[in-house]
Amino acid sequence: MTLSRRKFVRDLGISGAAANFAMGLPSLGWAASGISKKRLIFLFSPNGVIPKHFWPDQAGELQSLKRILAPLEPLRQHVLTLQGIDNRIKGDGDGHMRGIGCLLTGIELFPGDVQGGSDTPAGWSMGISVDQHLKNRLQENPETQTRFGSLEFGVMVPDRADTWTRWSYAGPNQPMAPISDPYQMFDKLYGQTQNKAMLASVLDDLSDDFRKIESMVSPEDRVMLKQHLEMVRSIEKEIKSELQLSSGEKTTRHPVPQLEPNVEEQNDNMPLLCKMQMDLLLSSLVNDFTRIATFQITNSVGNAKMKWLDIDEGHHSISHEPDSNEEAYEQLIRINTW
């Protein structure tokens, strides 16, 4: 089948969002030549891990995973742990500020006027972060350019700009703000919508577009299309459920344990917010909107209360308990595993 991209979109009357996904289906002839796209996601969660229950006991092929990494067991053959790569950054700022502010930059913080819990005050990072460096490299090459060079996702990141809330840097003194609101991220990915009701409408149109494409692709691509359609429907369902809840209507959605039935940015909604952001992240990768992303859960010194794990005390507070406190030790393992 020989068909130009422009004619394909015009004749089918599908949206740009659906077309962008369709262009990557091999049976339509526009996919890259057999070479898998390389993608990279950096994930941040605060307050460290319990080493004994995270790192393997010996080097080499992983025969088993420790308790914290156990959820990755179905993917164990693809898991690689890199121990001993230490980012020993000195300079201004306390350990928490340097812990996040230098994590992806590998360089010190500028002197500044932000005072941490100890040590000298500090400012932003002195250099670019590795995610933005890779973004720039990919965007320079027409074959690896994407609509968004990178995407910065957040979950419950405080609405303030300081050294504790930023880890991605476009350059010296240029922190990148993560987007914590999944609806705002949807707007970024799929266009500037006026309200949440329009989001559901856009997703509904996408579903129709994918059905138009279905008969034109191979059985293998049809499987990919079906998976993508299911993901779109899942996000659409969550948005419609939130709209129903805000208007007082009943919903049949199974609630996330111990969460209020809404999708507001609040502590108890963290599991649902994580899922919605991860769905959008997956969507952006499948659509090849980006190949580089950061996913930031709260912030340095993050003190979320993991009530869905039956933990009422703040995460950061628990992390300062000694290992001899068996209850706190166990709580940290559960938090790390989650």
Which residue ranges define each predicted feature?
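Ligand-binding pockets and gating/stacking loops
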Residues: 1-338
